[in-house]
Amino acid sequence: MTNTEIIATMSRCVCGTRIRWTQNQDNNMHRGVVDEFYPQNGAEDAYLAVIEPERYIPVLSASEIQKISILEDQHHNA
């Protein structure tokens, strides 16, 4: 995926959106729930705050992601 495609997918995420992604440094598929999306801001890359089953990832930047997809288009009310 291109960086533009990754950011476009990230921008569709809201709190509770379930996603899966592959990071550049590994080939493992990760799954988690989005906590918040932060758009690109000047020199700062767009990023997501994500909750995985075993950990919280406060910054998952677009440049770290190789491939991302939304598992569902609905979000869950917390």
Pin down the residues of each PLM region:
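Intrinsically disordered, low-complexity, charged/polar segments
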Residues: N3, L48-A78
